[in-house]
Amino acid sequence: MKAYESGIVTRHTAAPAGGGKLIVLTAPLTEIIDHAGYFIQMSMASLPMWLEGILNKKYPQWRIVEYNPDGAARYMPAGVRVLEASLLRRFKADDIVCCYPDDLAKFIGPDTRIVAVSTHNPLGVTFAAGVYTSIFGSSKQPINAHYARDMFAKIKSNPWRASYQVMVGGSGGWQISRTNAYDELGVDCVVEGRSESAETLALFDQALRGEKLPQKVDVHHPQNRDEIIFPDKRTTFGVVEMTTGCGRRCQFCVPDLNPQIDLPRDRILAHVRANVRDGNRQISLATEDMFIWGQVHTKTPFYFPNREALLDLYQNVVNTPGVEQHVLSHATIAPAVVDPVLIERLTESIIDKSPIHLPVLSTHPKKKALVPLVGLETGSVARAKQLMPSKAVPFPIDEWPSVVIRGLEILNRHNWFPAMTLIIGSPNETDDDVKATLDVIYEVERRELFAFFIPSIFTPLHDTRMEGTKGVTETNQLTALQWQLMMKCWKMNLRPGQASWWAPTVWRLGAIVLWAWKLRKLNGPGFTWPMFLFAGAMPEWLMAKMGKIYLGKPLTIKTRKELLKTIKPSMRQFVRADTGDIPDDFASSPAAEERRLFIELTPEFSSFNRTGHDADARH
């Protein structure tokens, strides 16, 4: 279908009639685009601005965007779409526009009273962003922060600036309030929280009355699924909200502070269809843990996945007419150990719609793979007990290394190769903690497993339980062991590129050149040998024998059957018999036996209906 036949135009030059829109919604261009794939957005959040040319060469058309016939943006981040839908409860559609930053001057006029911005990383201080920009030295500003500043400059310099107030929301708003960057960026008010709240609408009413907004406002998160708004328009990457909250109570996590809610199946699917209707061919269900959906506030603990409910939801999403691609969001690794059958059957349902190909790793006929985002964070049991004591439930956190290895075995077997985040330099981290994490990384390598390990320097994010704590803040503060952990992760991440001899060779040679030219002076004395490790300058065993690196000790990893035995007796009834490896003493549980007999005698019975709720009402 041609652009004009679908109502899509690729540029808009006409000025709006009248005095501009009453309310203008926007976001940085780097957070809006989706046609170049997920990789470019992740790169823009991490790479310094001076490396933008690399992305420009690989994706020369990344700035080209699509418009609706009226000049409004064809797609927007999900948060902006939720705000738009929330405002439409109070205001006329003709009073509101979502536009790209380059088109702000076409919609802002004397009648404009509010410009509302959603931004993820305006100052470049999220988990991964500061790490890789500071490694390279000359600029710590990542690409997406540059484009955020460019957007704010356009808003601040508009000739009608005196007529409107600028409100900022999104996950990066705290960066502005914490650094007091209001005047620098031309921001009047930072709003923390969701746009569905009555407080958010009250702020818009206040601004429209001409009243001065407070600099910072905290608004409430919806407390139940009925309060959450689903937009009816296309979102960037086809993001459709699936759950809020998580429930594992990690100290460093912002979303876990939100209520644990799984959203209704029918409303999720309706938003999927809305994305397809507006031209989207890719869908991603947004969640902090995909495996809790269908098991929130039921008679079964959320860390035992509702297999039938999840299969039903994902099958309906990928089989929606018009959906050509589906990308997984966040997950935890313990559920893979709890229910490997779920991983197997889910793979059968969704992998054919994955746009990700990993020829060196995948056993899929078309070399397709699934790459969810999974938190490893640390391999140290001592650190895990302090930072994330519930990360491994239903298994005890003492078994975290075994849960990670066994979970990764199950995932890899079915062509899941997760992107696993690690935190380096958290408060009170010791050399022993770093060694314990390296032990896990080397164990993954010894067992020929694979994950994309994404290390980042500790960032005490606003409103987390660790706000106000201090760990490593700059790369030149990293110890040699911490540098080794970072470089070992990135060396292992090169494995998917081993299909060609030249790609890893060029990368490693380039690393040595950068080290000799600049990086050895910028990143401290502990950087040199880890960089040689990354570049493959000499065998790791030799560097270890010289005392320059830590090689990682082999770990004793429990089998899945041994892990199942560590589950509390009261929880064993929720382990499904068809997953295998069931310990003998599980049979002694009366609840487990009752459950087993009931399922055997009721073939049509499924966990989709055994939650104790009416299935139609919930899903």
Spans of features found by a protein language model:
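A solvent-exposed, charged loop/short amphipathic helix patch at secondary-structure junctions
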Residues: 39-70, 122-150, 300-305, 386-396, ...
